[in-house]
Regions:
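C-terminal interaction-tip segments
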Residues: 1-18, 24-26, 37, 101-117
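Terminal beta-strand-rich extracellular "head" domains
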Residues: 40-83
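Beta-strand-rich interaction surfaces with strong enrichment in secreted/lumenal proteins
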Residues: 7-12, 22-25, 67-70, 81-85
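Solvent-exposed, conformationally flexible loop/turn segments
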Residues: 12-19, 30, 73-78, 90
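Intrinsically disordered, low-complexity segments enriched in small/polar residues
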Residues: 13-14, 23, 58, 72, ...
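Short, surface-exposed binding/anchoring microloops in extracellular/periplasmic proteins
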Residues: 25-49
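Noncatalytic modules at the cell exterior or secretory-pathway interfaces
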Residues: 30-37, 84-107
Length: 117
C-alpha cells in the first residue's frame, strides 16, 4: 500500500528588503507549489511621495515586479503576489523576493510555498 506524504509547506519571513526561500529537490516526484509573497511597509505620516515595490524571482529569473505609491500615511501599506510553480523531480527551487522603497520602510517581507495536495 502506497503512503501519501503530507503536503510540504516552506516559509520565510524577514524584516529586511531581501527574502530567500530554498526548496530542496525531491528525486522521486514532481511537485506543484502555490507561492505567496507579501510585503508590508510602514508609511510615514508626513511623506506624500513615498512608494514601495516588490520583485519576485524564481531560480534567478524575474517572474513579477510592481511599484506603487504608498498610501495610508502614518500606517502600513503593502503588496501581495501569488503564482503557481511546478518543480520537476530532481532539482531544487530558489525563490527570492526583493523590496524597494522610497520614503516608506520595510516592516515585513514574507514568502510562503504550499505544495498542492
Amino acid at each position: 500500500m502506497a503512503t501519501h506524504a503530507k503536503p510540504e509547506l516552506w516559509r520565510t519571513e524577514v524584516g529586511d528588503a531581501v527574502a530567500v526561500l530554498n526548496i530542496p529537490g525531491a528525486l522521486q516526484r514532481r511537485r506543484t507549489f502555490d507561492i505567496d509573497v507579501s510585503l508590508v511597509v510602514r508609511v510615514p505620516a508626513e511623506n506624500e511621495e513615498a512608494w514601495h515595490e516588490l520583485t519576485l524571482e524564481v531560480d534567478g529569473r524575474r517572474q513579477w515586479s510592481r511599484r506603487i505609491q504608498s498610501n495610508c500615511p502614518g500606517q502600513t501599506d503593502g503588496l501581495d503576489y501569488h503564482c503557481r510553480s511546478v518543480l520537476e523531480a530532481g532539482p531544487a527551487m530558489r525563490i527570492r523576493a526583493v523590496a524597494g522603497t522610497h520614503g516608506s520602510v520595510v516592516q515585513r517581507l514574507l514568502i510562503e510555498a504550499r505544495e498542492e495536495a
